[in-house]
Amino acid sequence: GGAEATANSPVVQSLNVSTTTVLRCRTYADGSYPSEEIIRTYVFEQQPSLAAVFVTTDPLSMFSADSGLYMTGNSASMMDPKYGANFWSNRELPVYVEMFEPGSPKTPAFGVMGDFKISGQYSRAKEKKSFSVTLREEYGNKRLKYPLFPDYPELKKFKAFSLRNFGNNSGDDYVRDRIGTQMTEGLGVDYQHGRYVIVYYNGKYYGIHDLRERNSEYYYETRYGLDPNDIDLLD
């Protein structure tokens, strides 16, 4: 699943769905423009105690062995972190992102189009990778208007957000990264709010990730209402 609906896609009148499935649908008629594409994820999983994030995108663009953004590709070095691999590219992919909250498993809390980009440093070579999603006006949504972090309902407008693989600790623990961040709460310094979520790509389970505020000029828009064009970030 995940491939964009085109005029060459299979035509269906009705469809029975019994496993977790992503559907991308569009109507075509002679002499008319194609309809807007509708993307929906149908979930047949045991209700988790964590929120679930479903990422839908063209499967070849993401997972093709040769050119997929998530994959090693043909130009990577042998040693980690495999410089030259596809996942070191700055390329972005259009994705559709849905989020299901634990208490409302039947209806997504939101569904938005955005640009997907692999992030991180050495942990890019891990099987599970960190990534960011950035909303674009060209997709119809300049901002995500939803409180991503239930403990902080005042934060409800986001240009971008990150889903981390827990960095170099990925696969070893899921605690250190979050605790290290949360310990700064109350110290009067800025830090990224976060929460644990599970992630699916095109309906396939990809494990627990750390949903975070994106560390960029838009962080200050969300937190303080500042114009991101007035922010200069220095590394």
Task: Write out the residue ranges for each language-model feature.
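Short, compositionally stereotyped local motifs that mark structural "simplifiers"
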Residues: 1-115, 137
